[in-house]
Amino acid sequence: MGRHWPYEAILSEPYLGVAASCAKQYTARRDKYVPGGQMWVTESGDAGCGGNTWGSTYADVPRTLNELGEFCTVTDGVIFHNTLASSDYGYLKHGTFEPRPNYFAVLLWNRLMGQTAYDSGIAIEEGKHVYCHSRKDGKEGLVYLVINNSWTEETVVELPKEAEVYVLAGKDSLRSRTMTLNGKELKLGENDALPCLCGEKAEGTLQIAPGGCAFIVL
């Protein structure tokens, strides 16, 4: 787990499964000494055994979102990312504080995903990492996070009804330093105003490109 991974492995099941595997290693001890206690991750991201060259690009977003989604299926608690505005994997670019793709991805997670995690009923496999939560806005319904960790194949989602979707992708490639939301670049506006993190209405079939991630609000 604690080792450097090659870029070619970033969408692989072993790589994406590291966070949950680590959490599961400690659940037995937690249950023995502090039954029902929360588990906190005090340093996430590239904090341990780092040196990756893609931490500041969209390529790290599937890992980040998968870590949040899968961690919630093991335990509740808090995940701290190291670091906010220093190093190549900070959420903000050092010196300019320009938001990187992971910043917007985590901001969307916090705006959309509620505190209650549910079993999505869909087994994890290549192209289909699916996580389900209550809605953060308190309304009835559910929010799904779908991560397509295939390098080559689209993931097709059949929407049961009209949904609000937030589809994330790299602007030109996985290693792009700019992320798009429903095809629009996410970048600061005048006076460093945040862009609109707005969803789009969709119904029928939703296609998620290789390496893409989507929040689906139903």
What are these regions (language model features)?
Residues 1-59, 74:
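Noncatalytic carbohydrate-binding groove/subsite architecture in carbohydrate-active enzymes
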Residues 1, 42-45, 81-85, 146-150, ...:
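Active-site-proximal beta-strand/loop segments in catalytic clefts of secreted hydrolases
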Residues 22-37, 70-77, 112-115, 204-210:
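A structural motif corresponding to the C-terminal end of an alpha-helix
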Residues 159-208:
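Acidic, Ser/Thr/Pro-rich beta/coil linker or hinge segments at domain junctions
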Residues 113, 117-123, 156, 188, ...:
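C-terminal non-catalytic regions of proteins with extracellular/luminal or membrane-system context
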Residues 40-135:
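Aromatic/acidic polysaccharide-binding cleft in carbohydrate-active enzymes
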Residues 1-4, 46-51, 86-90, 152-154, ...:
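Flexible loop/turn segments at secondary-structure boundaries
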Residues 126-161, 165-173, 210-217:
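Carbohydrate-binding surface patches
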